[in-house]
Structure formats: structure tokens, C-alpha cells
Amino acid sequence: VVLFHYLAYKLVGKQVDHWCMTPDDLSFLSIATWKNTSIPIEADGNYSRCTMYDPPLPISQENRTAVPCHQWGYDIANKADSIVSRFDLVCDREYLYDLSEIVPLFGSGLVSPALGLVADHVGRRPVMLACAFTQLFATVANTFSETYPLFLFTRFLIFAATDVTFIATFTLLHEVTGNARRSTFTLIDIAVPHIFVPPLLHVISIVKPRWMLANALTIVTTGLLASWCWLVEESPTWLVATRDLRRAEVTVLLAARENGVDVAKARTTFKAIEGQLRRLDTCAMADPMEAIIETMKLRRRAASVLLARFVMDATYISLIMNDVTTGIRWEAAYVLSSVVCYASALGCMRSCGIRKTLSGVMVMASTFAVFEAMVMSRGEKVLTLYVHAGLKVFVSTGSGVTLCYTAETFPTVVRNAGICLSHFAGGMGCILGA
């Protein structure tokens, strides 16, 4: 759902050819006649998109003046199918198009850390539910928006709510999965959308769906997400970390019942763990120096996480939004290559650990980036496409491994806030990349 919103402009943000609109009193003129008669020719030989002659029709031998226009005609079957024509984001209003990309990214980056703190204090589930239904209502409002300010505001709500929902669900998945399978499930959670959503949207964009149909796809997926969030229980790991042991026991016993584990045995095991937790709390109070050392280590790891998220997100968003390797063959090659790369990364995470895997993936991505710069400087267009495709695969994989490393870096009591803070760094990178 996050990538559906991030890449929505592939469907509803198409650039549209435009020209100054024919006045009502000259509406009998064909578009070709109007352009030949009333639109200036630019230096490149094309008709001007933003100016027209005043007066529109020659009424004497005097020279006519080219003046800017404030209404436009568009080369699109339905004006409402692209935000460019829907809100007239052309000529002196063209900057509003870029603004509609930057404001949601920046706003989401600012809001996410605050909501992350809330999730660490009141729980993953309440924040996840609130944000899931917020993005559903905001998506519906965005679909029916008729003015640019409403569109921009609802898009900001969508980005903020969607990002926080994803972070909460990812954190929940990380916390309820055992150590043996954690790397598998968390990486798959990131790999599936990274691999399949960009090609899927490319295929959908080929058929040029109408505004309502394109948004209906997002509304349906968001509705399914909200329904799933409603059925999810609170993270027992967070409940234990915050010492809400009564609720933690209820959740653990429910999970035991759902997974066919003997409930009485699960209750006995939980009581034993509860006793160990009390002894650990006593030891922690007796040795405050150890807590200080752990805090210093956490700060160093957090700094590396923030830098990694900034770099990887900036590169990934830039590659996805300005992709040059488009077409069915390229998309199929991307899917196959990404599956192999993610599978290799998963194997490395199991055998070498997340940190070494992330370092290796970033080295490969950096190598491809340098190689692409070299072949581009030499004008090797065909080779550039292949190198670009490889870079996109490694950056996508690196983004996934970075998020897994982020979840491992922060302890449970501040994990959601830590991931959201790294998302802020990534959001700043996204703005740079966009």
C-alpha cells in the first residue's frame, strides 16, 4: 500500500500536452486552426504552451502581442484523469506539481517520529488502527477532491498515515516472530512490494486507467489493510517490555491456542519468564553503569542506521520515480533479478548476520552507481540501461536489509520511535531523490 501511494503518479500524475484554451466566442474553431492562428511558435518550432496572441485573431496589419494565458486545453480524453489537467498544474502553476510530491514526503517525515513515540507508549495496535483507517478515509477524500488544496492536504494525510501503519505492522511482525524465522519474514515483508508493485503499476499504466478506476485500486487495497489491522492483536513483546504482564499473558495464551500449543504448558512457561523478568529488573537497578554503556552503543548504531536510510531511500526513490528501464521485458528482468538478489541477501543474513549483509549490499550498489556514472559519461546508452537495472535491484535489496537492520538496532521500548526516526531520515533522502 505504501508503494501504491508513492508511485501513484504513474497512474494519475501523467504529464499532458497543453495549450492556451480557445475563448468561448471562438469555440467554433478547430484546435488546429486555433493553434495556427492564435498560438505563437517557439524557437524549437513547437507551439507555445503558455502564451497566445492578443488579440487572438489578426484584425489589422499591426503586430500582435504574445500574452500569458490562464486557461488551457489539454490533449487528454478526460481532463480529470491526470492531476496536471485536473488542477491546471502547468505554466506558472507547474511548481505545484513538484510541491504535491515534496510536501507529503516532508510532512510524513516530520509526523512519523511523534507517532512512533505514541506507539511506544500506548501500543502498536492503537496507532496502527488509527492510521490505517485515517489513510482509508483520506484516500477516499483524495479521490473525490475537486480543489488542489484539498488534494494536497489529503495526500499529506495519506503519506503520514500509510508510512506509520507500515512501520507499526513491520514492528509487530518483527516482535512476534521468533529469532529463527525473523529475518525470513521481515525481509519477505519488504521484498514482496519492492519486487512486484513497481512492475504492476507499470503494467496498469499501459492501459491508461481513468481517475476513478486508478484510485479504486488503492481504496480496495487500503480497505483490506484496515480490515487486517482490526484483527491483529497487540505485540506481546512490547507488553512484556513495558511490564504489562497481565495483557501479555492473555495475548500469549491466545497465540498458543491459535497455534495448537498446550495452553496449560504455555501458562506455566509464561509464569517462569515473569519471574525471570523481575530478577532482571532488580539487577538492572543495581548496575546503572551497564545501562549507560548500552545507551552509548545504541547511539552509534542509530547514527549508522539514519545515514544508511537517508542514502538508500534517496537513491531508491530517485531510481523508481525517474526509471529509464521501462517496458515489459525490463520489468520481467527486474522481478527475476530482485528475487535472486533478495534470496541471496536472506541467505547471507542467516549465515553472516544483518550488519555484514547490509555492508555487502551497499558495496555492490555503490559499485554499480560508479559504473553507471562512468558509462553515462562515455555515452554508452545501451550499457547504461543494463547497469541502471542492476543498480535498481541492489538498491531495492539494500533498502529492505536496512529496514531489518533498523528493527534489530533499537530495543523494544523505543523500537517504533527508532524506526520512525530513521523514516524521517529516509524521507529527507526521498525529497532529495525526488
Predicted regions and their residues:
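C-terminal transmembrane bundle
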Residues: 3, 7, 155, 159, ...
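Structural signature of the two symmetry-related core transmembrane helices
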Residues: 126-141, 149, 192, 340, ...
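Helix-breaking motifs and short loop linkers at transmembrane-helix boundaries and internal kinks
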Residues: 123, 144-149, 161, 178, ...
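Central mid-sequence intracellular linker of multi-pass
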Residues: 14-63, 70, 207-280
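Intracellular juxtamembrane helix-capping segments at the cytosolic ends
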Residues: 84-87, 164-177, 319, 396-413
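Glycine-rich segments within core transmembrane alpha-helices of 12-TM secondary carriers
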Residues: 2-6, 105-111, 162-167, 171, ...
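Flexible cytoplasmic loops linking transmembrane helices in multi-pass membrane transporters
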Residues: 42-95, 257-326
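Hydrophobic alpha-helical transmembrane and interfacial-helix anchor sites in secondary transporters
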Residues: 16, 118, 204, 348-351
